[in-house]
């Protein structure tokens, strides 16, 4: 994210906006060179040391999967908005919002920032969402105490023919303010002077370069991973390098066994002919040499003084430090090899859960911003069926962790028995209940159906009691009929 000394009024002038875009583009490319490219290199296994074990990818992927692999649920305190929010949750699922948000979270876990574009196509009744590449995207803010977004941009690199012998590479830039989307370009990738992408020859060319939108805010929303805007593995880059350096040396040590140097002490080899014979004996794994003045012959290979056990102990120590500092545990370790109670599991995952809670606090405001843009768009197209009061929204995250549902069900039953259970809140705590609103409504319908069946059975039993008792001959006829059925079935079976 980039801060510029400008205001929302400045960007209404195209010339000022273009100059700000040029400054922002230069700053962005500098951020990519100095930081973000390195973050993605570590994630892809291209760090300072050859990555025998890609710890950065494990940390970034695992933390993001814990945090946002299950999309957050939106609910409301207002009963009159409940139906609209339920419809929005379903619509967001159909629009692939969960996948887009997961990709945003993945980028934020890697480099500290992720970007989500809210957009629409012609005649859309509901917005669409896509995650943008941080290496080609950024959002610019003013310098207020509470910075507000001025504009966002994303760009692609393109090539054009200058003549039959020469090509020109340039950036095509999409710039979004709170009112318009601009289509711009640079002269080249080295000359970042900005101007309109389409030549303005006709009146309609202006609309191709400057298209209005109706989200009421800059449609690119920045999602911070933490207050420092760093990735989850950033704090352990040095340890990752040390870990992989030792791993690389250990592998080289094994490969070099065949090239070990033989050290001979107090041995007379002799002339060239005797030396050739000595080498031949070595090839046959035999050593024969003359002792010098009875001083004692000694022969040994020069090897690394560190044994494989010593190296593995050092690797385990560094690995433990990596997972402790990054707060992302190693789930393949012995600590997670046995079944544990819910409390014991939470203690092991305390740092992991704290990391997820920090991400929640950073994502909350960005998600509320996206919901406001959705609401603005729905109000503009007068789709009242989906509109809602954003200030009353509650965001519920479900962390993708192993859980002891048996203990949780016991607690829920105990609360229900003493009359202190909120059914919906109880359902939220169960990992296997994905859509607690739908589950709750279906459960209510099932209870009503069961009650109806029980009531009908009671009525049937009451009616039977009111019927006149059967006479003896009627009972005899019924008994004979039953016996006849039984004997008939026996004959058929024979």
Q: How would you label these PLM feature ranges?
A:
Residues 277-293, 310, 317-494:
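C-terminal helix-loop subdomains that flank or include functional centers
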Residues 1-136, 140, 485-494:
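Extended, helix-rich architectural segments
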Residues 89, 105, 240, 244-247, ...:
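Short, well-ordered alpha-helical packing segments
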């Amino acid at each position: 994210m980039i801060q510029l000394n400008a205001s929302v009024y400045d960007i209404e002038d195209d010339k000022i906006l273009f100059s700000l875009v040029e400054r922002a583009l230069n700053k962005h490319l500098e951020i990519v060179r100095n930081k973000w490219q390195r973050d993605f290199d570590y994630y892809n296994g291209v760090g300072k040391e050859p990555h025998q074990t890609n710890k950065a990818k494990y940390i970034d992927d695992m933390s993001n999967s814990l945090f946002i692999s299950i999309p957050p649920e939106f609910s409301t305190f207002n009963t009159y908005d409940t139906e609209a929010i339920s419809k929005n949750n379903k619509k967001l699922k159909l629009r692939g919002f969960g996948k887009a948000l997961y990709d945003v979270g993945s980028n934020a876990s890697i480099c500290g920032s992720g970007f989500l574009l809210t957009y629409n196509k012609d005649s859309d009744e509901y917005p669409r969402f896509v995650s943008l590449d941080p290496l080609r995207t950024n959002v610019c803010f003013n310098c207020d105490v509470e910075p507000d977004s001025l504009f966002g941009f994303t760009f692609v690199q393109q090539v054009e023919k200058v003549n039959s012998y020469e090509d020109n590479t340039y950036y095509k830039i999409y710039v979004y303010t709170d009112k318009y989307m601009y289509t711009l370009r640079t002269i080249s990738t080295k000359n970042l002077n900005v101007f309109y992408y389409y030549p303005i020859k006709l009146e309609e060319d202006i609309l191709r370069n400057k298209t209005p939108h109706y989200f009421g805010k800059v449609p690119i929303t920045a999602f911070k991973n933490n207050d420092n805007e760093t990735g989850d593995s950033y704090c352990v880059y040095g340890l990752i390098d040390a870990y992989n350096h030792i791993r690389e040396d250990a592998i080289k040590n094994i490969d070099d066994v065949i090239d070990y140097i033989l050290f001979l002490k107090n041995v007379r080899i002799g002339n060239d002919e005797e030396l050739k014979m000595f080498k031949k004996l070595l090839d046959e794994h035999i050593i024969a040499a003359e002792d010098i003045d009875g001083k004692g012959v000694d022969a040994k290979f020069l090897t690394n003084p560190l044994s494989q056990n010593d190296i593995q102990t050092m690797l385990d120590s560094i690995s433990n430090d990596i997972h402790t500092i990054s707060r992302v545990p190693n789930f393949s370790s012995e600590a997670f090899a046995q079944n544990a109670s819910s409390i014991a599991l939470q203690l092991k995952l305390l740092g992991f859960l704290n990391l997820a809670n920090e991400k929640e606090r950073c994502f909350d405001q960005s998600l509320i911003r996206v919901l406001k843009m959705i609401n603005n768009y729905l109000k503009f197209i007068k789709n009242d069926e989906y509109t809602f009061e954003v200030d009353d929204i509650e965001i519920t995250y479900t962390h993708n962790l192993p859980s002891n549902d048996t203990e949780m069900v016991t607690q829920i039953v105990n609360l229900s028995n003493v009359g202190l259970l909120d059914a919906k809140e109880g359902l939220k705590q169960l990992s296997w209940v994905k859509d607690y609103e739908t589950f709750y409504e279906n459960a209510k319908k099932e209870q009503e159906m069961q009650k109806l069946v029980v009531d009908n059975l009671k009525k049937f039993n009451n009616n039977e009691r009111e019927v006149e008792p059967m006479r003896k001959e009627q009972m005899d006829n019924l008994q004979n009929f039953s016996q006849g059925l039984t004997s008939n079935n026996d004959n058929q079976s024979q």
